């Protein structure tokens, strides 16, 4: 995510269908901060980010996208357009072609506000008319799937399979390994999705090595891509799971009062002192999954760079 403070600030209350804790990390992440974060966290490594806006506020979508495009052109890096479902096919195509985006980012909070969280379907914020445009242009869509059932939800699985079958030329990426942060989020999803030929998962903001292992075994390392989800993964935290739910362990007081957030738990003392960055926890879990699935050096290079480079049309 790449955004300026004055653009994302809004008096409007956050959509209740969204997790609240990611907003605790940074109220701004301009391109300069993003590039410096990569330089500091990955010394000696060349990182090519694919940038897109923060997902709110909706009434500043034009400014959010314009800033990202300006940054992408200045730094010669790929970018995704934050797209709204009410845009016509013609409007979406014009924005994509004129401004040279590599695809779109869509989000469940753009579904009609009258729909409760568990009644939102993928097509409510990624309509078929827009899928047809992406298919015709051969572009990518970064999809954060809805519903509390996450990856195992049968409605989600049904629509993912429909998209795979009906739009063979677009590049569908399921963010956060389909939001399967816990093993209980998976169900029989990978048994179903291993029949797909193009569907891709990204690892971003997920630290479940077992889920990563299942995903790699289901679709292969050529359909997995590394993502940072910065600035969210700049958090000092470690994720655990309890009773089928994820919990973010953070140093007491570092992110203000988190007592009312069921996804957060504060810790103190030596345990808190040992906490690293969320992004390092993600990479540690990728490493564990890579060892357990016996990936070779070339396959690891693919999932950290080559696969995304190819999918975004950069190779």
Predicted regions and their residues:
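Active-site gating/metal-coordination segments in enzymes
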Residues: 48, 56-149, 195-200
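H/E-rich (His + Asp/Glu) clusters that bind or coordinate divalent metals
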Residues: 177-315
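Short, flexible/disordered intra-domain loops and linkers
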Residues: 7-24, 113-121, 151-152, 183-184, ...
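Distinct, well-ordered alpha-helical segments
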Residues: 61-69, 89-97, 150-166, 181-193, ...
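An N-terminally biased module of ancient metal coordination in phosphate/nucleic-acid-related enzymes
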Residues: 1-54, 59
């Amino acid at each position: 995510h790449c955004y300026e403070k004055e653009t994302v600030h809004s008096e409007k209350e956050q959509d209740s269908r969204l997790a609240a804790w990611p907003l605790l990390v940074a109220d701004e992440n301009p391109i300069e901060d993003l590039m410096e974060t990569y330089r500091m966290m990955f010394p000696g490594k060349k990182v090519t980010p694919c940038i897109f806006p923060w997902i709110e506020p909706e009434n500043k979508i034009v400014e959010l996208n314009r800033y990202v495009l300006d940054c992408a052109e200045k730094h010669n890096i790929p970018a995704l357009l934050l797209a709204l479902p009410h845009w016509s096919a013609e409007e979406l195509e014009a924005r994509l072609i004129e401004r040279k985006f590599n695809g779109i980012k869509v989000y469940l909070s753009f579904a009609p506000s009258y729909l409760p969280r568990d009644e939102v379907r993928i097509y409510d914020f990624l309509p078929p008319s827009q899928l047809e445009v992406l298919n015709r242009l051969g572009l990518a869509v970064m999809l954060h799937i809805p519903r509390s059932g996450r990856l195992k939800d049968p409605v989600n699985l049904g629509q993912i399979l429909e998209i795979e079958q009906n739009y063979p030329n677009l590049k569908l990426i399921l963010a956060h390994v389909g939001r399967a942060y816990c093993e209980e989020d998976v169900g029989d999803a990978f048994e179903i999705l291993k029949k797909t030929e193009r569907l891709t998962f990204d690892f971003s903001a997920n630290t479940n090595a077992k889920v990563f292992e299942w995903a790699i075994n289901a679709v292969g390392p050529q359909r997995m891509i590394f993502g940072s989800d910065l600035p969210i993964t700049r958090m000092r935290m470690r994720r655990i799971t309890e009773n089928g739910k994820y919990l973010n362990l953070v140093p007491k007081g570092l992110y203000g009062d988190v007592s009312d957030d069921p996804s957060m738990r504060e810790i103190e003392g030596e345990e808190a002192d040992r906490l690293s960055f969320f992004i390092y926890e993600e990479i540690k879990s990728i490493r564990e999954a890579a060892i357990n699935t016996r990936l070779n050096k070339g396959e690891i290079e693919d999932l950290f760079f080559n696969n995304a480079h190819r999918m975004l049309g950069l190779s």
